[in-house]
Amino acid sequence: MKTVNIRGVILGEGIPKVCTPLVGRSLKELREEINLLKDIDCDLVEFRADFFEHVENIQKVKEVLLEIREALKEKPILFTFRSAKEGGEREVESEFYCKLNKEIIKTKLIDAIDIELFNEEESILELIKIAHDEDVKVVMSNHDFHKTPPKEEMISRLVKMQELGADVTKIAVMPKGSSDVLTLLEATNDMKIKYAKTPFITMSMKGVGMISRISGEVFGSAVTFGASKKASAPGQLQVKELKEILNVVHNVL
């Protein structure tokens, strides 16, 4: 498996990298979160644009993104608009989803962009090409907030993302119990041993899935998500405690 360099942060080797989401709804809330990040030891920052109240005004998204970039300096930024069907804050037409992502890629303010697998393949391929032309890495993702699919299905989705040209692949699923968490970890381990050509991210949500967020170095997941203030998904730990746990795991391996 090859590693991926996102503004100096190497995914796919060593301790899983910690990504912290910005989930403010207003410019005021985002500024408060950005100030918090100055004292937080995360590796990447995810701007969850679907939380932003003015997200349908692309110019305002660009303006707030510029503020984020200026404040975070060289910290890698992942831009994400998570659709409602995959657990995000709002639904938009597919045309707007593509237009927003295209325009944000071209700002040169981001280092990576999240593209959801379950879109029209033609649109996905176009976004990947534009991103790669602008030296923006593609994190292709799938989120199931209702269930944990069978192991083979999760692997199939991750492999499909690789085949489409994603630099990093990601799947997050909802467990109904500990058996579902084991299924996710099995899929993760199989991906690491048999199929992964690029770094990948997996997680099982809610409290019962928390073990998947801290065991990436064992099973293969390259990135884990930790909250600075408000979590963007069920089961997220705070960055400080997450980093401490990851280091404990690393030191005993």
Curated annotation (Swiss-Prot):
Instruction: Name the InterPro entries on file.
Output: 3-dehydroquinate_DH_AS, Aldolase_TIM, DHquinase_I, Type-I_3-dehydroquinase
Q: Which reaction does it catalyse?
A: 3-dehydroquinate = 3-dehydroshikimate + H2O
Is the Nucleotide-binding keyword given for this protein? no
Catalytic residue list? 143, 170
Q: In which pathway does it act?
A: Metabolic intermediate biosynthesis; chorismate biosynthesis; chorismate from D-erythrose 4-phosphate and phosphoenolpyruvate: step 3/7
Keywords attached to this Swiss-Prot or TrEMBL record, sorted alphabetically, are:
Amino-acid biosynthesis, Aromatic amino acid biosynthesis, Lyase, Schiff base
Q: What is its EC number?
A: 4.2.1.10
One Pfam family, short name: DHquinase_I
Which residues are 3-dehydroquinate-binding?
46-48, 82, 213, 232, 236
Q: What class of enzyme is it?
A: lyase
Q: Which GO terms describe its molecular function?
A: 3-dehydroquinate dehydratase activity
Which biological processes are named by the entry's GO terms?
A: 3,4-dihydroxybenzoate biosynthetic process; amino acid biosynthetic process; aromatic amino acid family biosynthetic process; chorismate biosynthetic process
Which family does the record claim for this protein? Belongs to the type-I 3-dehydroquinase family.
Q: Which NCBIfam families match?
A: aroD (TIGR01093)
Q: What does this protein do?
A: Involved in the third step of the chorismate pathway, which leads to the biosynthesis of aromatic amino acids. Catalyzes the cis-dehydration of 3-dehydroquinate (DHQ) and introduces the first double bond of the aromatic ring to yield 3-dehydroshikimate.
Q: How does it assemble?
A: Homodimer.
Q: What is this protein called?
A: 3-dehydroquinate dehydratase
